[in-house]
From Swiss-Prot:
Name of the protein described by the UniProt record: 2,3,4,5-tetrahydropyridine-2,6-dicarboxylate N-succinyltransferase
Protein species of origin: Pseudoalteromonas translucida (strain TAC 125)
Domain of life: Bacteria
InterPro entries referenced in this protein's UniProt entry, alphabetically: DapD_Trfase_Hexpep_rpt_fam, Hexapep, Hexapep_transf_CS, THP_succinylTrfase_dom1, THP_succinylTrfase_N_sf, Trimer_LpxA-like_sf
A Pfam family reported for this protein in Swiss-Prot or TrEMBL: Hexapep_2
Reaction(s) the record says it catalyses: (S)-2,3,4,5-tetrahydrodipicolinate + succinyl-CoA + H2O = (S)-2-succinylamino-6-oxoheptanedioate + CoA
Main location: cytoplasm
Record EC number: 2.3.1.117
NCBIfam families, alphabetized: dapD, PRK11830.1
Entry keyword set: Acyltransferase, Amino-acid biosynthesis, Cytoplasm, Diaminopimelate biosynthesis, Lysine biosynthesis, Repeat, Transferase
Quaternary context: Homotrimer.
Database matches in SUPFAM superfamilies: Trimeric LpxA-like enzymes
Length: 276
């Protein structure tokens, strides 16, 4: 894989000269091979190594380069026609491939080629962009969007209309990451490379970017770009220094462990935020 990485890095340094008509056979194949690794889950844009998330920037660069080597082409889903550079992940799947993959793909769900969808994943009518990784047992509910190169852990629930930000537009340095066993409530948005750590519960309508204040009401601590493990987060506001106004913030109302989550349930956790 090191040779492939080197070729992608060199191509990236010369990306301004790459187009569908000028790209060499070797570089084009390297980009395709990198996307195949992402599509199969053999490689991913980010992975946790020794407790820390490591971003493989060369794979993100391969995703970006793929847009330079392809022309738009007509494609269809049997009902509608589309015109795009990126083929759909499941367009050529056979029934046997679906069985082996172990996922459920509901009509009108869309996943782009170069994304990975694990076993026991359920894709309701939703969108999974190129380079994304959706791990085993995750539910991507109706109208949820998993952005380019986003990393979604095992047994995550992305509720209806959730948006998980990508890295391509606008260009971001690091992907947005949702770790294992997280719950993201309906219409919430997590973007700009924010990391939601394992077991966190995000209520409905919470918006978190790198600049969003994430206030822990128990400790008074303010986090940026990271939701701590086991945090239960709701939308709220914090006052300005002069008290003249308040600005939006995400509020950590409590922290729970996995055992408590399993015993109590998500809805009970969110209903009881003022009980303590």
């Amino acid at each position: 894989m090191s040779d492939l990485k080197t070729m992608i890095e060199n191509a990236w340094d010369n990306r301004d000269s790459i187009s569908p008509s000028t790209v060499s056979v070797e570089v084009k194949q390297a980009i395709i091979d990198a996307l195949d690794l992402l599509d199969s889950g053999a490689a991913r844009v980010a992975e946790k190594i020794s407790g820390e998330w490591v971003v493989h920037q060369w794979l993100k660069k391969a995703v970006l380069l793929s847009f330079r080597i392809r022309e738009n082409q007509a494609m269809d889903d049997g009902v509608n026609q589309f015109y795009d550079k990126v083929p759909l992940k499941f367009s050529d799947y056979t029934p046997e491939q679906f069985k082996q993959g172990g996922m459920r793909v509901v009509p009108n769900a869309v996943a782009r080629k170069g994304s990975f969808v694990g076993k026991n994943v359920v894709l309701m009518p939703s969108y999974v962009n190129i380079g994304a990784y959706v791990d085993d047992g995750t539910m991507v509910d109706t109208w949820a969007t998993v952005g380019s190169c986003a990393q979604i852990g095992k047994n995550v629930h992305l509720s209806g209309g959730v948006g998980i930000g990508g890295v391509l537009e606008p260009l971001q340095a690091n992907p947005t990451i949702i770790e294992d066993n997280c719950f993201i409530g309906a219409r919430s948005e997590i973007v700009e490379g924010v990391i939601v750590e394992e077991g966190a519960v995000i209520s409905m309508g919470v918006y978190i970017s790198q600049s969003t204040r994430i206030y822990d009401r128990e400790t008074g601590e303010i986090h940026y770009g990271r939701v701590p493990a086991g945090a239960v987060v709701v939308p709220g506001a914090l006052p300005s220094k002069d008290g003249s106004h308040s600005l939006y913030a995400a509020i950590i109302v409590k922290k729970v462990d996995q055992q408590t989550r399993e015993k109590v349930g998500i809805n009970a956790l969110l209903r009881s935020i003022d009980d303590e």
